[in-house]
Amino acid sequence: MNTPAQLSLPLYLPDDETFASFWPGDNSSLLAALQNVLRQEHSGYIYLWAREGAGRSHLLHAACAELSQRGDAVGYVPLDKRTWFVPEVLDGMEQLSLVCIDNIECIAGDELWEMAIFDLYNRILESGKTRLLITGDRPPRQLNLGLPDLASRLDWGQIYKLQPLSDEDKLQALQLRARLRGFELPEDVGRFLLKRLDREMRTLFMTLDQLDRASITAQRKLTIPFVKEILKL
């Protein structure tokens, strides 16, 4: 996605991680709140937390995509990759329409980054126009941050836990991803994947992509025997 989402960092966000490709499961209220913040013209803040692989980054990528398509300037900061850049990359981000900070747990104990996030948060409050979305692997008060004022700020907004998908929802999510890629995932094949593979969604989606490519190359439909052959199960 070569859009204003790369205004601040040389990152390319995945084109297929949009709201249309996100299966909500038990997260409908969270999704509605997130989209409401994106629709409003003034600032808003949401903190999402969940274990890794639950879809936190997907939702931030989707938010960036939605506002970028409207022509708004957005910034995405993946703190799990903070060694690629310096805290000063946050300078001026309060001028953007949307700032997404992913994996904030990664800076716990890093004084420079904690202060940079704290200062950005305050500038965004003063601007009154920038939407702020932050994700972590636990609630703000449990982040073990060295800066108490930052933990307090993070606790101010709307806080949502991203609920994990049930197996039925995972099947629906896989079938949705397949349809968006232009092919069908038979129910029996989907259930076979859930039974035999790691059920973490990122792994399942990567496997689905692998099977899609193999199916195209072999010009064969997805069946359980074909899946066993490709995945060596």
Curated annotation (Swiss-Prot):
InterPro entries for the chain: Chromosome_initiator_DnaA-like, DnaA_dom, Hda, Hda_Enterobact, Hda_lid, P-loop_NTPase
Designated name of the protein: DnaA regulatory inactivator Hda
Function text: Mediates the interaction of DNA replication initiator protein DnaA with DNA polymerase subunit beta sliding clamp (dnaN). Stimulates hydrolysis of ATP-DnaA to ADP-DnaA, rendering DnaA inactive for reinitiation, a process called regulatory inhibition of DnaA or RIDA.
Coiled coil: none
Keywords: DNA replication, DNA replication inhibitor
Organism field: Escherichia fergusonii (strain ATCC 35469 / DSM 13698 / CCUG 18766 / IAM 14443 / JCM 21226 / LMG 7866 / NBRC 102419 / NCTC 12128 / CDC 0568-73)
Subunit: The active form seems to be an ADP-bound monomer. Forms the RIDA complex (regulatory inactivation of DnaA) of ATP-DnaA, ADP-Hda and the DNA-loaded beta sliding clamp (dnaN).
Family membership noted in the UniProt record: Belongs to the DnaA family. HdA subfamily.
Keyword Cell membrane: no
GO biological process entries: DNA replication initiation; negative regulation of DNA-templated DNA replication initiation
